[in-house]
């Protein structure tokens, strides 16, 4: 528990103090967010607001994770693990993609940033590397960071995406990992359209997973094989990483809350999406994450529905997509939408954690 608290605190401090440095840097160089003319008129006032604040979030996560594990190694109570490093690598890889996108927008005056092909290839390569590596590095018990089984609260034994390790099965698994990584990174990116919305929602999700992975650590099958135990390779280190994600997003949210002094940009949203995706895979809770991260699911689903219906029927389901803009178009104030969506996110988190804990109670009583 001490490691988790240290990680969250360090991440928060790094993020909350580094963010204003970035605000001053980008403001002095007159580098800010461009706002589309065809968008909501109320958002035009945000033109010129500094972006790329995700740098502070990533820095907070990295510094906290590294510092906490070095401290743990000195104290002889833990250290870096393969699972944590792989998720961190996924986060950094997608963060680098987002950074390139933001850099092109700001410094090369190309408002669309990376072209779709470059972004797709980058996400695909990062996801495939992550998907391959999470099946490597077995521990002394033969447990790898992830398995080819689909997972809800733990692996679902009857659904093996790897088809017993066949070449076809591994390809199917890698495709699945790409879908997971792409979906979550784009979902967080799409949600980042209102002041504080993506940062706040991610903080709720990371808070939930800090508890979930710590509970997996306390009830690990490595220490005692009993009803309700969890076969997760490195749950404590994952909890440390989740706490870093929680602290970093809260520190950034201090400056990103309405009216935002800075936006996280693709640098932050893609990185946080990678963190969400990676944690769901290595904690073996891919389907549970759909409940806990339901607001992200709603946001990306609204875009898919809008595009699908418009292309097939020539009609729009929402006034604007993603759905948070729909409510703004109805006349809701931006802060009203953000806070109500936070409430939805909190309810989703509570529901997901409740399902997780109820499962353990049920198995523990059997």
UniProtKB/Swiss-Prot annotation:
Catalytic activity annotation = UDP-N-acetyl-alpha-D-muramoyl-L-alanyl-gamma-D-glutamyl-meso-2,6-diaminopimeloyl-D-alanyl-D-alanine + di-trans,octa-cis-undecaprenyl phosphate = di-trans,octa-cis-undecaprenyl diphospho-N-acetyl-alpha-D-muramoyl-L-alanyl-D-glutamyl-meso-2,6-diaminopimeloyl-D-alanyl-D-alanine + UMP
Top-level taxon of the source organism = Bacteria
Intracellular or extracellular location(s): Cell membrane
Q: What stretches pass through the bilayer?
A: 3-23, 54-74, 76-96, 118-138, 161-181, 197-217, 238-258, 262-282, 287-307, 341-361
| Family matches, as Pfam families | Glycos_transf_4 (PF00953), MraY_sig1 (PF10555)
Q: Which InterPro entries match?
A: Glycosyl_transferase_4, PNAcMuramoyl-5peptid_Trfase, PNAcMuramoyl-5peptid_Trfase_CS
Q: Which UniProt keywords apply?
A: Cell cycle, Cell division, Cell membrane, Cell shape, Cell wall biogenesis/degradation, Magnesium, Membrane, Metal-binding, Peptidoglycan synthesis, Transferase, Transmembrane, Transmembrane helix
Could you give one GO CC term from the UniProt record? plasma membrane
Q: Which GO terms describe its molecular function?
A: metal ion binding; phospho-N-acetylmuramoyl-pentapeptide-transferase activity; UDP-N-acetylmuramoyl-L-alanyl-D-glutamyl-meso-2,6-diaminopimelyl-D-alanyl-D-alanine:undecaprenyl-phosphate transferase activity
Query: What biological process terms from GO does the record include?
Result: cell division; cell wall organization; peptidoglycan biosynthetic process; regulation of cell shape
User: What cofactors does this protein use?
Assistant: Mg(2+)
The answer to whether UniProt assigns keyword Metal-binding to this entry is yes
The first-level EC class reads transferase
EC number, UniProt record: 2.7.8.13
Membrane topology term reads: Multi-pass membrane protein
Pathway recorded for this protein: Cell wall biogenesis; peptidoglycan biosynthesis
Main site of residence?
membrane
Q: What does this protein do?
A: Catalyzes the initial step of the lipid cycle reactions in the biosynthesis of the cell wall peptidoglycan: transfers peptidoglycan precursor phospho-MurNAc-pentapeptide from UDP-MurNAc-pentapeptide onto the lipid carrier undecaprenyl phosphate, yielding undecaprenyl-pyrophosphoryl-MurNAc-pentapeptide, known as lipid I.
What family name appears in the similarity comment? Belongs to the glycosyltransferase 4 family. MraY subfamily.
Q: What is this protein called?
A: Phospho-N-acetylmuramoyl-pentapeptide-transferase
């Amino acid at each position: 528990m001490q490691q988790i608290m240290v990680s969250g605190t360090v991440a928060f401090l790094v993020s909350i103090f580094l963010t204003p440095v970035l605000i001053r840097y980008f403001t002095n160089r007159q580098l800010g967010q461009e706002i589309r003319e065809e968008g909501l008129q109320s958002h035009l006032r945000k033109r010129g607001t500094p972006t790329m604040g995700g740098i502070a979030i990533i820095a907070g996560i990295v510094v906290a994770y590294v510092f906490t594990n070095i401290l743990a190694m000195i104290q002889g109570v833990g250290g870096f693990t393969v699972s944590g490093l792989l998720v961190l690598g996924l986060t950094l890889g997608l963060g680098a993609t987002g950074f390139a996108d933001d850099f092109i927008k700001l410094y090369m005056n190309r408002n669309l940033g990376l072209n779709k092909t470059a972004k797709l290839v980058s996400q695909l390569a990062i996801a495939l590397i992550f998907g391959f590596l999470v099946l490597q590095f077995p521990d002394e018990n033969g447990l790898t960071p992830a398995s080819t089984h689909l997972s809800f609260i733990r692996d679902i034994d009857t659904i093996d995406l790897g088809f017993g390790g066949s070449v076809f099965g591994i390809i199917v698994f890698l495709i699945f990992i790409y879908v997971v990584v792409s979906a979550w990174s784009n979902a967080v990116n799409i949600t980042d359209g209102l002041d504080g919305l993506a940062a706040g929602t991610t903080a709720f999700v990371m808070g939930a997973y800090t508890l979930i992975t710590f509970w997996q650590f306390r009830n690990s099958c490595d220490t005692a094989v009993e009803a309700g135990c969890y076969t997760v390779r490195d749950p404590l280190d994952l909890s440390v990483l989740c706490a870093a994600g929680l602290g970093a997003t809260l520190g950034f949210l201090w400056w990103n809350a309405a009216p935002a002094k800075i936006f996280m940009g693709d640098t932050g949203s893609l990185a946080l999406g990678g963190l969400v995706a990676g944690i769901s895979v290595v904690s073996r809770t891919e389907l549970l994450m759909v409940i806990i991260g339901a607001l992200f699911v709603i946001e990306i689903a609204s875009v898919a529905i809008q595009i699908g219906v418009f292309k097939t029927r020539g009609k729009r389901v929402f006034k604007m997509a993603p759905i948070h803009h729909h409510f703004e178009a109805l006349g809701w104030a931006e802060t009203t939408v953000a806070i109500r969506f936070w409430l939805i996110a909190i309810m989703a988190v509570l529901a997901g954690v409740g399902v997780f804990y109820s499962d353990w109670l049920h198995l523990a009583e059997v």
